[in-house]
Amino acid sequence: MSHPALRQLRALSFFDDISTLDSSLLDWLMLEDSMTRRFEGFCERVTVDMLFEGFVGPEALEEEGEFLPDEPRYWLREILLCGDGVPWLVGRTLVPESTLCGPELALQQLGTTPLGRYLFTSSTLTRDFIQPGRSDELWGRRSLLRLSGKPLLLTELFLPASPLYGEEK
C-alpha cells in the first residue's frame, strides 16, 4: 500500500445518510453501471495502471473483513484508472479465494483490463449495496458485488482530476 492514493482510499469514512448530498454527486457515487463506461464518455481512452495484484491474508482486510467471508486468502487488486493517461480513480478489489472458481477465475487474469469491462458483461452480476464515503476533500464509495452469488468488495476513490469534480461544481 505504498501509493499515496491508496492511503487516501483506506482513510475513507463511509456513511449511510445521503439525503444532504447534491444530485450530480449522487449520480456518480450511486452509479450502478460501469464506472469505466462512464469515464469513457469524458476521454479518448481509459487505461489501468497496476499498483498491486496478488493473494493476501485476512490481516490485509481491516474493516473490509466484515463484508466478506472468513478465508485464509483473498485476491487483492489495486489500480489507478486513468483517462487519457491522467489518474482519475484508485480502485481496490478484494476477492475471497472461494469466489475464484469457474468463470470467476478470470478475475485473476484481468491484468490491465478495467474490472468494469469484465463485471458488466456478466449476466450473473448483482450488487448488495453502494456506500458513499469521503476522505478529506475526495469522494469515494464501496460496493459489495456478487458474481454467481459469490462476493467481491470494490472500493473506489475519485482522484482530484476525475470528471466527478468538474460536474460537482
From Swiss-Prot:
Biological processes annotated in GO: pyruvate biosynthetic process; ubiquinone biosynthetic process
Reactions listed under catalytic activity: chorismate = 4-hydroxybenzoate + pyruvate
Gene Ontology annotations for the cellular component aspect, listed alphabetically: cytosol
Pathway as given in its UniProt record: Cofactor biosynthesis; ubiquinone biosynthesis
Pfam families: Chor_lyase
Localization per Swiss-Prot or TrEMBL: Cytoplasm
Chain residues that bind substrate: 35, 77, 115, 156
Gene3D superfamilies: Chorismate lyase-like
A GO molecular-function descriptor: chorismate lyase activity
Top-level taxon of origin: Bacteria
EC number, UniProt record: 4.1.3.40
SUPFAM superfamilies reported for this sequence: Chorismate lyase-like (SSF64288)
Record keywords: Cytoplasm, Lyase, Pyruvate, Ubiquinone biosynthesis
Main location: cytoplasm
Subunit structure comment from the entry: Monomer.
NCBIfam families assigned to the protein according to its UniProt record, in alphabetical order: PRK11655.1
Function of the molecule: Removes the pyruvyl group from chorismate, with concomitant aromatization of the ring, to provide 4-hydroxybenzoate (4HB) for the ubiquinone pathway.
Family: Belongs to the UbiC family.
Descriptive protein name: Chorismate pyruvate-lyase
Source organism per UniProt: Cronobacter sakazakii (strain ATCC BAA-894)
